[in-house]
Amino acid sequence: MALKIRLRQHGRTNRSFFRLVVTDARSPRDGKYVEALGWYNPVEAEDDKKLFFKADRIQHWLNLGAELTESAASLIKKTSPEIIRAQTEKKLNSLAKAATKRKKKD
């Protein structure tokens, strides 16, 4: 089961808010999810009430192999840039490791 961390839309017309959830990549946007990780309310005026994410749980799911969608990644970057930084470093390390493996092969 491929997992994604993405936004799930709630609310009413012109008053949408979103929940950050872990879900199967094949499920619909507002379908069943595994775990709720936070919320985002773009209508809220105060910045501290606009975003809330559980950084430790996001990191847990990323370590298990879940992927971030672009919109979720941009919101997480605002509140917890260290999570995005850690994911980027992990990708760069794996790419560097693969490159050295290819060089040794040649």
Curated annotation (Swiss-Prot):
Q: Name one GO molecular function term.
A: structural constituent of ribosome
- According to its record, what are the GO cellular component terms? cytoplasm; small ribosomal subunit
Query: Could you tell me which SUPFAM superfamilies the record lists for this protein?
Result: Ribosomal protein S16
What Pfam family does this protein match (any one)? Answer: Ribosomal_S16
Gene3D superfamilies the record matches: 3.30.1320.10
The GO biological-process annotations, alphabetized, read as: translation
Cite the entry's keywords alphabetically.
Answer: Ribonucleoprotein, Ribosomal protein
InterPro entries with a match to the protein in the record: Ribosomal_bS16 (IPR000307), Ribosomal_bS16_dom_sf (IPR023803)
Source taxon at top rank: Bacteria
Family affiliation: Belongs to the bacterial ribosomal protein bS16 family.
Name-wise, this protein is: Small ribosomal subunit protein bS16
